[in-house]
Amino acid sequence: MSKDDQAVSAGRRPFLTRTLGLLSTLPFLSACATGSRGEAAGSDSGGGFAFGIVGDIPYSRAQEAEYARVISEMNARDLAFVAHIGDAMADPRLYERLPAEARMPCTDENFAYVLGTFQSIRHPVVLTPGDNDWSDVVQFKKTKMDPLERLQKLRAMFYPKGRSLGQNTMGVDSQAQDPAWAKFVENLTWKVQGLRFATLHIVGSNDNSRTSPEEYKERQAANIAWLKRAFAAAKAESSPGLVLITHANPEFENRWTRSYASRYARSVRGADAPKAPPAAPYDAFLDALIVEMQDYSKPVLYVHGDTHIYRTGKPLHNPKTQRFFENLTRLETFGWPDSAWVRVAVNPGSRELFEIHPEYAPANSPNFRAG
């Protein structure tokens, strides 16, 4: 979702976003036992490595050139993989306002372009979808598309069985290996040097909850089940931590106390927080995450995009202790109009485990160019 579109959706986002403008561990454990899938090449346990995060780009034809520079920079680095957190194309409303400046989103041709950019990356690549990639086609006024048909096409194009995308692929496991969740090929898991990763298909724009409530409920149940399996696997494997990668900003503030929320709201807008946040489509997932975190003491990195503001922090509140979880770090990557990426170094000798480095291509920034 673009920054222009954030203004459009401000009325839809609840609470501070508005104020601010053990289940079965199959397939995780089977992969661990065999070492044949879901494990990046050369990933002996215990060493350090780095991976790349990018997302919410490219939206415009001008940004495509900037994205090419980002890809060139990532290709020049030693990375275990690259994760694109979704919204790999423009919002339909942006396209219809400026059709000469962006590709028409969610067409087969645009999907092919996006896939081509992923295949130009020399590292393994994984995608977790965003709302621009399928659910926001309902925003078209001049074109009719079915979001569920587009989701089906996205799944068919971007999720080869058992492998990542990219020039050098890695083995991955999918939630679809469980017959109970056979359609959710996009929920992936893998390991690098003993560290467990998992993607969860949660998108912006209210997670498709208003357009297709039944699809949303089914996918939410799948995501919660996948979340529980990720934590169970991380514990069973003695993983040094856990990395969760998704698209949507899950609105952590919706689970803050009013005292915390009021202080935060005043610090950025001089406004008070509402007495109680309205229900949001991400609440059930956040509640499940809180429950898992209450029984997990190792570092967790929660990666997302959606609101296009690079930031890190400790935003998940524990209602039992009335404190924020020190061992969960949020990382939101850059997004349109900024064309940059984030390198995460995994350092087993560090208490935090994750060392986060924003990476800029100077030619992509008017700030650098002005200097």
What residue ranges belong to the model's regions?
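His/acidic metal-ligating clusters that form di-metal
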Residues: 75-81, 191, 196-198, 211-316
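Active-site environment of divalent metal-dependent phosphoester hydrolases
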Residues: 60-62, 90-93, 129-138, 205-210, ...
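N-terminal active-site segment of His-dependent metallophosphoesterases
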Residues: 36-108, 239
